[in-house]
Structures are given as C-alpha cells and as structure tokens.
C-alpha cells in the first residue's frame, strides 16, 4: 500500500 499525508 502507498499512503500520503500532511
């Protein structure tokens, strides 16, 4: 899985 957050 690839997850991006700020």
Curated annotation (Swiss-Prot):
Of the GO CC terms on this record, one is:
extracellular region
Give GO terms: molecular function aspect only.
Answer: cutinase activity
What EC numbers are recorded for this enzyme? 3.1.1.74
* Induction field: By contact with cutin.
State what inhibits or activates this protein: Inhibited by diisopropyl fluorophosphate (DFP).
Superkingdom to which the source organism belongs: Eukaryota
What keyword terms does UniProt attach to this protein?
Answer: Hydrolase, Secreted, Serine esterase, Virulence
Q: Does the keyword Transferase apply?
A: no
Known catalytic reactions:
cutin + H2O = cutin monomers
User: Does the record carry Hydrolase as a key word?
Assistant: yes
What subcellular compartments does it reside in? Secreted
Coiled-coil intervals in this record?
A: none
Supply the enzyme class, top level: hydrolase
Location, primary (coarse class): secreted
The similarity annotation says: Belongs to the cutinase family.
Q: What does this protein do?
A: Catalyzes the hydrolysis of complex carboxylic polyesters found in the cell wall of plants. Degrades cutin, a macromolecule that forms the structure of the plant cuticle. Allows pathogenic fungi to penetrate through the cuticular barrier into the host plant during the initial stage of fungal infection.
Give the free-text miscellaneous remark of the entry: On the 2D-gel the determined MW is: 40.5 kDa.
Question: What is the name of the protein in this document?
Answer: Cutinase 2
- Give the source species: Colletotrichum kahawae
């Amino acid at each position: 899985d690839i997850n991006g957050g700020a």
